Every structure is written in C-alpha cells, then in structure tokens.
Amino acid sequence: MSRLGRIIVEAVAHTYGRDEVLRRLSHPFWFQSFGAVMGMDWHSSGITTSVMGALKRGLEPVRWELGIHVCGGRGRHSRKTPDELKALGDRLGIDGAQLTRHSRLVAKVDSAAVHDGFQIYLHSFVVTDDGNWTVVQQGMSPERKLARRYHWLSEGLDSFVDDPHAAIAGMPHETNIINLADHRAKQSRDAQVELVNAGPDAVLPHLHMPLHHDVRSGNVVMSRLRGALTAAANRCPVDFTELLLTRGVGQRTVEALALVAEVIHGAPNRFTDPARFSYAHGGKDGHPFPVPLKVYDKTISVLRGAVDAAKLGNDDKLAAIKRLDREARRMERVAQTGISFDELIRRERKRSADYGGRTVFGWAKNSMSASAERKAPAKNQESAQLSLWSDAVVR
C-alpha cells in the first residue's frame, strides 16, 4: 500500500501541485476511493489508519524532495505530532509553533468541543513546505462498533470553532449531541476560552453507505466502471503505444490503471461510489475479491516509471495515464451494455489465483467457489474492525 500510495501522491503533486494533494485528502469521497484503489477494505474503519500509515511510510524517503510531510498517526504516534511539527518548522523556516497550535486546536475541537461519543485515536497532520496543511482524525465508539472520520483543511479556514470541518464522515447520530463548534452554539462559545464568532457554512453533500462490507452491484455506478473497462479493452492504441509495450502490461493491468488514473485526475463528483475503485486491486479482506498481487505490482511499476520520467522532464507516460482516464469518460457515455457487475466479480474470483490473489487469511486457490474464497474470520476478528459508515453522512 505504501508504494502505490506514494506514487499516486507524487503523480497528483507533479500534475496539479502540492496543495491539490491536501485538498483531495480532505475530501471524504476521494479519500475512500483512494483507499479502495490501494487494496484496502472499502468499508471499514481500517481504511483511515491504513491509508495515513501507508502515506507516512511511503512518503518518508521523498518528503524533502516532494515537499509534503505526514506527521502524527495512530495512538502514541499522535502524541509525537507537536515535536515533529516543531522540528519541521526549524528545518523549513516556517512557524512550527503555529502549526503545533493548529494541531492541538484541531484535536481539542474534535475531542472536547464535539461531544458525539467518539473518542479520537488517530491524528494525522499533513503539511507542505509552504505551511499549508490538512488533518485527518478518526474517533471510535466501541459500544456502537462504529468509527467517525474528521477532515480539516487550512485553505479557506477562517475559524477553528465556527463550522471548521472540511467534512465529517460517519453514521448519523441517533441522539442529540453537543457540538460547540456549530455556528448555532455562539452563546455557549462566548462563555468559553478560545471559542468565538459564529456563522453559517455551506451544506456538504451526503454519502449513504450500507452496513454490509461486501461489494454489491448497488454500491457501484456501473456505467463508470464499464467505461473504464471498455477503455482498457480498446487499449487507446494511438496514445498508449509506449505504455502497452511495457513488459507484462496486459488488459487487466490497464483496467487497474484506468481506475488509478481516475483517482489521480478525476473531479470530486466522480467519487460518489468509492466501492467501484476496489475493482482495481480487490481488498485484503477478500471483498470484492483477493488482492491480485501480480496486477498490483505491475500497476506500481508502470506508475513508478511514469512519475520518475516526469521528474526528468519527460511527461509522456504520465500524460498517457491521464489520457486513459479521459478515454474512460468517453467510453462511459457509449458503453452502456456489457458484462454485469456480479459476473465481473465472479470472473475475478475465478482467476484470482492466476493473478497471485491474496487476503489477510491467505492465498487464493483455483476452483474456489465465491462463498469459500476466503476463510471466514472468527467472531473476535470481526469485532476488531469497526464499521466506518452505515447510511453515513458527510456534512
């Protein structure tokens, strides 16, 4: 995960700039799609910790070159955030003390000003050389077996206590909560230190997600997926000649690349069905199918070559990946019929072993039925992973 995550971030930064990386990490739909295309369980609390952990590890070797730094993390790592930010400020010549104050205030708002029953256990602070930042936090409610993710973005942030979130992703609360960061809590804030000002914020779109973790046809906008697959089948012969000459690149790799290309280049409204991106590399829990390691490694190889060439001034391969995304959009408008989602998943499961399919439960085997494709986890294993959303609301 760390290798693929690093390459995608490098591609976004090279094409659109470092600040665009921050904007995308603060967008819950893109974040979920990013995790899914990396092979994470598309519908669990683990996607947040895994994505941020993978980014911190993956970007470490190139962070000074790239100018993007991931501080903090889960549990004890979150408590190291102030020291990491101060050290970063000293090296870059930016105000590390102010960044530390922002980090603490963000953590304090979500843990002390928002009383929603979720205890914060992850705090990841991503900052650029320019001092711009985004924060991804996650809290858990063990009693309800649910998690909630909080997104912050420094760009356009006027107040830390007046509807400051870029988004909050989680299940709607059944009971009343105390949210002192809501603009309607002005009278209460006026009586407390550092809680000032009030004002309305724009209403963000809603993302509704089910309780089940398996990927079903209803979770996917099939026209979008079919467009990507059709573009892969057509191979974009004029634009993709050089890419397709890469040793080992076949139709399945191009299918995965088409979805990765959309994560790099897609507009925000393209990420309303994040489950679709799990088709690129499956999921480590076996949903919708085991991670095809051969395809996964080839995707990394192609992207790595494209990004490295772009750093040397040759953008042809990176531009070719962008054209694949554009071709998928075009085919989406015309490829309205074809293989169904269920048939597509059955096909991937059937050939999973040929692609080096693997889950956290072991390697995929030939001639497996869909129901027996992976060993069922024990009850204590199921309870160890919290559900991120159930009819989730992003607000």
Whereabouts are the PLM-identified features?
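Helix-hairpin-helix
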Residues: V215-R224, D239-A261
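Helix-turn-helix/homeodomain-like alpha-helical modules used for DNA recognition
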Residues: Y296-T299, L303-V334
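Intrinsically disordered or highly flexible coil/loop and linker segments, enriched in small
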Residues: H43, E255, G266-R270, A309-D316, ...
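Phosphate-backbone recognition surface of nucleic-acid-processing proteins
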Residues: Q251, E255-K311
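Active-site-proximal structural scaffolding
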Residues: H27, F118, V221-L225, C236, ...
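Short acidic (Asp/Glu) and glycine-rich catalytic loops that position anionic groups and cofactors
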Residues: V9-H14, H208, C236-P237, F277-G283
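Structure-specific DNA junction-binding interface
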Residues: M1-H212, R326-V334, I345-R395
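Short, amphipathic alpha-helical "recognition" segments used to contact nucleic acids or chromatin
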Residues: A228-A233
